[in-house]
Amino acid sequence: MVNMKASMFLTFAGLVLLFVVCYASESEEKEFPKEMLSSIFAVGNDFKQEERDCAGYMRECKEKLCCSGYVCSSRWKWCVLPAPWRR
């Protein structure tokens, strides 16, 4: 009976140790994707949005005209794709 208790205790202790090691390595790996994403999506001066003379899709069209291929929705005042009944 003692051998069975000892083997169960060692098995349980091994599983706990395995869990701790996996958790520690996973927490270190979590920093890598954050660093990678922050370097990929870093916004510099080169990537600023240009100001257009026309409004694009789902942009307000109160003051600006919609770009070609879009129409101003009379209900929402957004630039939307033209539907067959709007032509």
Curated annotation (Swiss-Prot):
SUPFAM superfamilies: omega toxin-like. The presence of a 'disulfide through disulfide knot' structurally defines this protein as a knottin. Ion channel inhibitor. It is found in: Secreted. GO terms for molecular function: ion channel inhibitor activity; toxin activity. Residues 1-24 form the signal peptide. Keywords: Disulfide bond, Ion channel impairing toxin, Knottin, Secreted, Signal, Toxin. Expressed by the venom gland. The keyword Cell membrane does not apply. PROSITE patterns: HWTX_1 (PS60021). This is U3-theraphotoxin-Hhn1a 4. Pfam families: Toxin_12 (PF07740). Residues 25-52 form a propeptide. Disulfide bonds join 54-67, 61-72, 66-79. InterPro entries: Huwentoxin-1, Huwentoxin_CS1. The keyword Secreted applies. GO terms for cellular component: extracellular region. Belongs to the neurotoxin 10 (Hwtx-1) family. 51 (Hntx-8) subfamily. Hntx-8 sub-subfamily.
